[in-house]
Amino acid sequence: MSTLHHRLTITDLAALKGRQKIAALTAYSTPIARLIDPLVDFILVGDSTAMVAYGRPSTLAMRLDETISHTRAVVDCTRHACVIADMPFGSYQASPEQAFRNCAQVLSETGCDAVKLESNRALAPTVAFLVERGIPVMAHVGLMPQFVHVMGGYKAQGLTEASAETIVEDARANLAAGAFSLLLEGVAEPLARRISQQSQQPCIGIGASPACDGQILVTEDLLGLGGPQQPRFVKQYADLTAVIGEACARYASEVRQGEFPELAHCYGS
């Protein structure tokens, strides 16, 4: 973990490649962001907000105004971690100009440090357009949830020669376009290892390889708040579902039995 003297930048993240693994998590709200801020190198305000915070069926339902609201909340309560906003589906695919307009709005209204785009070769020119105009971009390749209907579901990528070649070409195109980092999701381990070793920019894995330059998980998943069915790549470090359930059950029981509040919890008593 890096020092707490300043908010980390994309330059700081790049400098960690080959020196120290990058630890990253998601956050959508002040309580979680404040807790993880001193512990991680960057926080992703993911489009997974749509599912985790709002209970929607997929990330496709995330809206731009929600991205701005949640990212601003995370930026306002953190001081250390680099904050990256995940651009929602439909906010950047139509044209480079649309992408710049929406990404610029996110950066200017939230104070975040960079944006993340799910980007294949076809969108690499958009990445270049953004970088040339001052917007740092992390490119997400491999399993891209915003492409779920095209990909036929949430399936691991790079398991066949053709799929692996597609991912390699997507990665190369985005790095050549100026992406400061790659996020490799659901990519076959040998392929993710090779891309990470060959890339001069940090490669962050989620369901990819321990050889990646860093790792990211959805915070609620590692805390046991993500529901009973989790992807293979999730490691649960705590079971807060049980802890929270027990605490709330005790509260409800004490209220119904007249045990809470006690006079110690009241004013003027």
Swiss-Prot record:
It catalyses: 3-methyl-2-oxobutanoate + (6R)-5,10-methylene-5,6,7,8-tetrahydrofolate + H2O = 2-dehydropantoate + (6S)-5,6,7,8-tetrahydrofolate. Gene3D superfamilies: Phosphoenolpyruvate-binding domains. Mg(2+) binds at D47, D86, E118. Its main location: cytoplasm. Pathway: Cofactor biosynthesis; (R)-pantothenate biosynthesis; (R)-pantoate from 3-methyl-2-oxobutanoate: step 1/2. GO terms for molecular function: 3-methyl-2-oxobutanoate hydroxymethyltransferase activity; magnesium ion binding. Keywords: Cytoplasm, Magnesium, Metal-binding, Pantothenate biosynthesis, Transferase. Pfam families: Pantoate_transf. Its EC number is 2.1.2.11. One of its GO terms (cellular component) is cytoplasm. One of its GO terms (biological process) is pantothenate biosynthetic process. InterPro entries: Pantoate_hydroxy_MeTrfase, Pyrv/PenolPyrv_kinase-like_dom, Pyrv_kinase-like_dom_sf. Its cofactor is Mg(2+). 3-methyl-2-oxobutanoate binds at D47, S48, D86, K116. SUPFAM superfamilies: Phosphoenolpyruvate/pyruvate domain. Binds 1 Mg(2+) ion per subunit. The active site is at E185. Belongs to the PanB family. HAMAP family: PanB. Homodecamer; pentamer of dimers. This is 3-methyl-2-oxobutanoate hydroxymethyltransferase 1. The lineage of its organism: Bacteria, Pseudomonadati, Pseudomonadota, Gammaproteobacteria, Pseudomonadales.
